[in-house]
UniProtKB/Swiss-Prot annotation:
Subcellular locations according to the entry: Mitochondrion
The family this protein is said to belong to: Belongs to the TRAFAC class translation factor GTPase superfamily. Classic translation factor GTPase family. EF-G/EF-2 subfamily.
Organism for this UniProt entry: Drosophila persimilis
Binding site for GTP: 40-47, 104-108, 158-161
Annotated Gene3D superfamilies: 3.30.230.10, 3.30.70.240, Elongation Factor G (Translational Gtpase), domain 3, P-loop containing nucleotide triphosphate hydrolases, Translation factors
Domain of life: Eukaryota
Protein name: Ribosome-releasing factor 2, mitochondrial
GO biological process: mitochondrial translation; ribosome disassembly
Length: 737
């Protein structure tokens, strides 16, 4: 902002002063805000940690428990019944003079898209680890997502009250599995009663929580000279030594001082904050959310080490004082209608304000609310850096960028390019800025699909409306119409995802829909290149329609559509208008959505236009339909092979059960990648297996292991199939198996 103000040329002095004062106000206002996400593998204790934060901050009067179904952040009926987080929820609470906006995100792989959108709204994250399990499959997934967004993070090792908890292993997992630099600022200890206590590395104190008042208070005790104190002093010295190699201010003090004992706690904290915000290290804390230990110090660490909004998202400075807000979630309230959760990146949103979403639709903010899961407090205006709920937005979808106007967005993109030394504005650079602003959403491929039908014809419209609303909330839910069967088809991320959708339609919209059997979302790819010419001539409503297209399909991983610019075809293609080329492209690419064998999406395939002759007065719709028909003919001629979704599994079981589990996996066409020791008695199997072979596998695993094994599963791409498996897959899709 300042660099735009300082280079403003002949801007009137009063206007410049107003902009500078607004800039200073925004900075001072947002310095007391922390926007954080809570990320974890399923069952690591993420929601329990969130509930304790709300309780100790005074936001709630009682402790919410997952197993009792009375949590604030898991407010959906399905979440409370299952004890898992399905939708991201936002809560705001005060702590030590700061305002913390916290997003509790799902831990189950089926809801990864919820996590992805939420990370656009936060400035830092807390990653919760299960102290008995360390880094798990979904931990790696959410960590990778946080890396993508360049988010500073803290690690909180939970469940440290358990006898099988292993703090050192968790720290080593962070270092080896996540390839990060963990910095331990706490270590586990025991108090006089044998309960979990925490030794603070920086202050050299032992922290003990009081069970009688539900952990509201805790005592700090300076450690007496002992082996524990000597070990903790060594850890403090190691911390100073590690940070001094990363922070110049601390290094200067260390060089000039005679002893590490002379380095103040405040100086260590400042150095650790800078290193954390620069993503050079990850501070590691510990506790037990369920036993009410360590949560207040975790909130202190959020305030101390994670960045304020003003320290992040400088890319949005190009908006100046104009509004820039990222939509990261939409929920539907029975009384208030659609409610849109927005992270305000720049500017101020006021009640009654007119906004433009990045897709061009105009919206009016009828009301503004402060978030507390499913409760709302109305406010009049919200400043940059904060999170707000907007009512009245009718067209906005998850992932949109809200701005004051289309002009504001274009000017911001132009300023951004100028600041990066790019003055031209070609299409590729436009796409780059869209990606930088997070406008270009990447929706994961569905791995399952099924038909959905209303209980009666009269409920069809209501069901379609419910699906539209659920799609606005959840971009990973695919809804399409199968013209062959006449059915509405849902695509989703897993069995749980589809089950939750059905359950929500019943509980929230009172429609008892019928889901068809789950089908694997196979993909198709061509076997060999193929070229053909299709000429179609027809008279429609007295107007002659005439199209002749020569198209080719070839193997290609990058581009969907290209032009054959060879000398014999270039002169013809140069006569086509850009609009005509766009129509041919749209029709051709649409045909790739449904392959000839099982109706799967055709991938790794490029359509190449060689020649096009279009009669005068021919409608665009006719050209588009001809292009689609031509590609369908090519796919049938060239033939396609099936690609099936592959899942990556981590199975943990006692050593004596491993042979039986591996024998069963081999019958499921699984590829064993590794078998690793997991503690003293267990082993962990890393395996890839086709999704088609994993139906009901959780139950089968329980039977084989007598209930002693656990499993996590997540998508791991697509793989080719042999002819026998392809034939079996076709029979399954046709309902013959």
């Amino acid at each position: 902002m300042l660099k735009y103000a300082l280079h403003s040329g002949g801007m009137p002095r009063n206007r410049l002063l107003r902009q500078l004062s607004a800039y200073i106000f925004r900075r001072s206002y947002s310095s007391n805000i922390r926007n954080i996400g809570i990320l974890a593998h399923i069952d690591a204790g993420k929601t329990t940690t969130t509930e304790r934060m709300l309780f100790y901050s005074g936001k709630t009067r009682s402790l919410g428990e997952v197993h009792r179904g009375n949590t604030v952040t898991d407010y959906l009926t399905q979440e409370r019944e299952r004890g898992i987080t399905i939708c991201s929820s936002a809560v705001t609470f005060p702590w030590s003079g700061n305002r913390i906006n916290l997003l509790d995100t799902p831990g189950h792989i089926d809801f990864t898209m919820e996590v992805e959108q939420s990370l656009y709204a936060v400035d830092g994250v807390v990653v919760v680890l299960d102290g008995t399990a360390g880094v798990e499959a979904q931990t790696v997934t959410v960590w990778t997502q946080a890396d993508k967004h360049k988010l500073p993070r803290l690690a909180f090792v939970n469940k440290m009250d358990r006898p099988d908890a292993d703090f050192d292993k968790c720290v080593n997992d962070l270092r080896t599995k996540l390839e990060t630099q963990p910095v331990c600022i706490q270590y586990p200890s025991k108090n006089q009663d044998g309960l979990l206590a925490i030794n603070d590395v920086i202050t050299l104190e032992q922290l003990t929580w009081q069970p009688k008042d539900l952990g509201r208070s805790y005592s700090k005790t300076k450690l007496e000279p002992s082996d524990d104190l000597r070990q903790l002093q060594e850890k403090r010295n190691e911390l100073i030594d590690q940070l001094s190699g990363l922070d110049d201010e601390l290094a200067d003090v260390v060089i000039s001082t005679e002893s590490f004992d002379n380095v103040s706690n405040a100086l260590i904290e400042r150095a650790l904050r800078r290193a954390t915000c620069q993503q050079k290290v990850v501070p590691v804390l510990l506790g037990s959310a369920y036993k009410n230990v360590g949560i207040q110090r975790l909130m202190d660490a959020v305030n101390t080490y994670l960045p304020a909004p003003e320290e992040r998202n400088q890319i949005y400075d190009c908006f100046g004082n104009e509004v820039a807000g990222k939509v990261f979630k939409i929920v539907h309230d029975k009384q208030r209608g659609p409610l849109t959760l927005v992270r305000i990146l720049r500017g101020e949103i006021k009640r009654g304000m007119r906004l433009i979403c990045s897709r061009g639709q105009a919206e009016v903010v009828s009301k503004l609310y402060e978030p507390l899961a499913d409760e709302y407090r109305e406010v009049g205006a919200v400043q940059s850096g904060d999170v707000v709920i907007c009512a009245g937005l009718k067209s906005t979808v998850t992932g949109d960028l809200l701005t004051s106007s289309q002009t504001a967005l274009r000017n911001a993109q132009k300023r951004l390019k100028q600041s990066q030394g790019t003055v031209s504005a070609d299409e590729d650079e436009e796409l780059d800025t869209d990606e930088l602003f997070g406008i270009d959403r990447q929706i994961p491929d569905a791995v399952y699909f099924c038909s959905i039908e209303p209980p009666s014809v009269s409920s069809q419209t209501a069901m379609e409306q419910a699906l539209r609303q659920l799609q606005r909330e959840d971009p990973s839910l695919r809804v399409s119409y199968d013209s062959v069967t006449g059915q509405t088809v849902l695509g989703g991320m897993g069995e749980l995802h589809m089950d939750i959708i059905k359950s929500r339609i019943l509980s929230e919209y009172k429609i008892d829909v019928d889901l068809g059997p789950l089908q694997i979302a196979y993909k198709e790819t061509i076997e060999s290149p193929s070229l053909t010419t299709l000429s179609v001539e027809k008279e429609i409503a007295g107007s002659k329609q005439n199209v002749s297209l020569t198209l080719e399909v070839v193997k290609d991983h990058d581009e969907l559509f290209s032009l054959d610019k060879s000398p014999e075809n270039l002169s013809n293609l140069n006569t086509l208008r850009p609009r005509t080329l766009q129509v041919i492209r749209k029709g051709s690419v649409s045909a790739l959505e449904r392959g000839p064998r099982v109706g799967g999406q055709v991938v790794d395939t490029q359509i190449r236009l060689h020649n096009a002759i279009i009669g005068r007065g021919t409608a665009d719709s006719f050209v588009m339909a001809t292009a689609a028909q031509c590609v369908q003919k090519l796919l049938s001629t060239s033939g396609t092979r099936l690609l099936e979704p592959i899942m990556a599994l981590q199975i943990v079981a006692p050593s004596e059960r491993i042979s039986g589990i591996m024998a069963d996996l081999s019958r499921r066409r699984a590829l064993i990648n590794d078998v690793l020791p997991k503690g003293e008695r267990n082993k962990m199997i890393l395996v890839n297996a086709p999704l088609a072979e994993l139906s009901g596998y959780s139950s089968a695993l329980r039977t084989i292991s007598s209930g002693t094994a656990s499993m996590t599963m997540q998508p791991s791409g697509f793989s080719g199939m042999n002819a026998v498996d392809e034939s079996l897959a076709e029979r399954r899709v046709q309902g013959l198996e």
